[in-house]
Design a protein with these regions (language model features):
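Short amphipathic alpha-helical segments
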Residues: 16-19, 73-77, 117
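C-terminal binding/interaction regions
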Residues: 6, 10-13, 89-161
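Structural motif
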Residues: 6, 32, 64-65, 86, ...
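Helix-adjacent hinge/juxtasegments
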Residues: 45, 49-85
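A short beta-strand-loop structural module common to alpha/beta enzyme folds
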Residues: 28-39
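Glycine-rich phosphate/diphosphate-binding loop of Rossmann-like nucleotide-binding domains
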Residues: 4-24
Length: 161
């Protein structure tokens, strides 16, 4: 299995530990950055990873930031990505079984033993292929296909203070 992984500066230590852990389990791991604890903005890394998942260059992705929230929001802007911010093994199981999530977002402050358990459950749980879940995913895909474009005409967010 091929896994993409990315983080911001706060998720970097956890990302590095996960790379070692996954490599020992014989996963092929592609690191999309960042490469240090120097402060960075997570969207750049989330978008790169999301594109690799959406384009089927990898089977799954893992993103890590301080809370897992911001980087998951950024990942979910990539068409075809279903990124779930997960805090426990039950959520890891359900997001795969019910939502067919293809990217796992983690809190960089979470204990490593918990992170490893969550990752193991996420990768070892299959989508259930139940009609109601398939229908929900298809509704999301249809919305993406009809409403999400590569470039938006929105004004850039600015802080004029």
């Amino acid at each position: 299995m091929k896994i993409a992984i990315a983080s911001d500066h706060r998720g970097y230590p956890t990302k590095q530990e996960l790379i070692k852990y996954l490599s020992k389990k014989n996963y092929e791991v592609l690191d999309y950055g960042t490469n240090s604890t120097d402060m960075v903005d997570y969207p750049e890394y989330a978008f790169k990873l999301g594109e690799s998942v959406a384009n089927k260059k990898v089977d799954f992705g893992i993103v890590v930031c301080g809370t897992g929230i911001g980087i998951s929001i950024a990942c979910n802007k990539v068409k075809g990505v279903r990124c779930a911010k997960v805090d426990n093994i039950k959520e890891a199981e359900l997001t795969r079984k019910d939502n067919d999530a293809n990217v796992l977002a983690l809190n960089g402050s979470m204990p490593l033993y918990r992170v490893k358990d969550i990752v193991d459950v996420f990768f070892n749980t299959n989508f259930t292929n139940v009609d109601r879940y398939i229908n929900r995913i298809n509704q999301i895909k249809e919305y993406e296909n009809n409403n999400v474009t590569k470039k938006f005409e929105e004004k850039e967010v600015r802080n004029d203070a």
